[in-house]
Design a protein with these regions (language model features):
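CBM-like, beta-strand-rich accessory domains located in the C-terminal region of large
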Residues: 1-143
């Protein structure tokens, strides 16, 4: 969010070993880069074909928020009115969302690192303006 990631959170890759396949971490920071006094992210494996990411943000005043989702270079993206379809070959993931404030999505060029190489990729941006913000993204594997 706003240029800060959850990579600094302890246990980022250990969630699968936690009870009931839930990961919950909280991070607070008053730096200018973050612009957030509190950001909590929770990852839940809702079913064998669905992951839900829940974000809660609390700010002292309303601000512009941006969440980035970096995509693999082989993923094709279709932005639709109420969903986003991510396709790689015959595999398709449908992304839906619920938010307590209006959000907008856009796609931009980006980079990712695979096998020690920098590759061109794309990024999904979710933007909102709020002091208090709740977001749930549902990542559903279709086939």
């Amino acid at each position: 969010m706003n240029g800060k990631g959850d990579a600094e959170l302890k246990g980022r890759y250990e969630w699968i070993e936690t009870q009931d396949y839930h990961m919950k971490s909280a991070w607070s920071d008053t730096s200018i880069e973050c612009a957030s006094h509190f950001w909590q992210r929770r990852l839940t494996v809702a079913a064998s074909n669905e992951v839900v990411i829940t974000d809660q943000v609390q700010l002292p005043e309303s601000a512009s928020l941006e969440f980035l989702f970096i995509l693999h270079p082989a993923v094709e993206v279709s932005l639709e009115e109420e969903r986003i379809v991510l396709t790689n070959g015959k595999t398709q993931v449908v992304l839906r969302w619920e938010a307590d404030k209006p959000v907008s999505w856009k796609l931009s060029a980006g980079k990712c690192f695979i096998a020690d190489r920098t590759l061109a990729s794309r990024r999904l941006h979710l933007s909102a303006n709020a002091a208090s913000f709740s977001l749930r993204t549902f990542w559903h594997l279709e086939n």
